[in-house]
Swiss-Prot record:
Similarity field: Belongs to the ATPase A chain family.
Organism for this UniProt entry: Chlorobium phaeobacteroides (strain DSM 266 / SMG 266 / 2430)
SUPFAM superfamilies reported for this sequence: F1F0 ATP synthase subunit A (SSF81336)
Membrane topology: Multi-pass membrane protein
Transmembrane stretches, start-end: 11-31, 109-129, 170-190, 199-219, 238-258, 262-282, 287-307, 308-328
Protein name: ATP synthase subunit a
PANTHER family assigned to the protein according to its UniProt record, in alphabetical order: ATP SYNTHASE SUBUNIT A (PTHR11410:SF0)
GO molecular function ontology, one term from the record: proton-transporting ATP synthase activity, rotational mechanism
Pfam family of the protein (one): ATP-synt_A
Keyword Repeat: no
Amino acid sequence: MKQERTSKVKGLIKVIALVVPFLLNVNAFASPAESAGVTHDSIAAVARTEGAHAGEAPHGEAAGHGEEKAGDVIMHHILDSNVYSFEPFGEIVLPKIVVGGFDISITKHVVTLWVVSAIVLIVFTIIGSKYKTMSPKTAPKGFVNAMEALVEFIRLDVAKANIGPGYEKYLPYLLTVFMFVLLCNVLGLVPYGATATGNINVTLTLATFTFVLTQIAALKAHGIKGYLAHLTGGTHPALWIIMIPIEFIGLFTKPVALTIRLFANMTAGHIVILSLIFISFILKSYIVAVAMSVPFSIFIYLLEIFVAFLQAYIFTMLSALFIGLASAHEEHADHEAGAAHH
């Protein structure tokens, strides 16, 4: 049993290493203006403008400018940009590349995607080498043991529970997505890190992978005839003119939900943290900073760590659920529908 489990983990690690490189530069979905975010020149201009007004404006207007500047700084941290700041040590201006109208520039979020992909490849390569040299009778320890527990959790509680028979062929993708989304979320909470999952282009690409895999699973399970028959909803031909558009639109609501859910949750958390921090600067009060800004920021930060894990789990679980629903046979679906009805 132990040897069989070890061989399965080895196989999963190999496939994961093959899937990860596809989760790289997704910036081509954005227009040049969107991907550039807040450029260095615009930030400098805002800073000069705010400095000029600060010496002239009355207290009320100065507070308004302070709020505006705080909003600019928050958006600078949230939006993608080709300027990677390492305050107070300086900044790195990343190259802008536009090919045939598509922006494939290297930005903060693209760098984060590369770093996350490298981490996933390195981690699973190390674990794979450990399993190659490990005796089947030897229990894994430390980090290897933790990763085996993670693999078993995704295998049993996510893939097998939501997909059912034949879940093994989708497990490498689910493991890769979970680790990828989790690391993207966590790196956004690290100093000088950027939250790639706070970029809707990234979440849209991840959701597109799930969408494509879901349609492939449906075609394999039901064939082209069964796949097209699903669009009619099993209704009378007279209702097809209504049901087919509804079912067709329904195909795209799932990836849209995945896209917005992950993007909104990760973006909102960072906005809340930065807003709480800037309250003390806007009001210019140390009392507010000590009594409210710092404690609430720490609380929200800890909550964001939990949300980082939760959103990675939810994205993976919903991906498995959509694959399971698409590949489920009619009798299995009817059985589930009957159980839900009762």
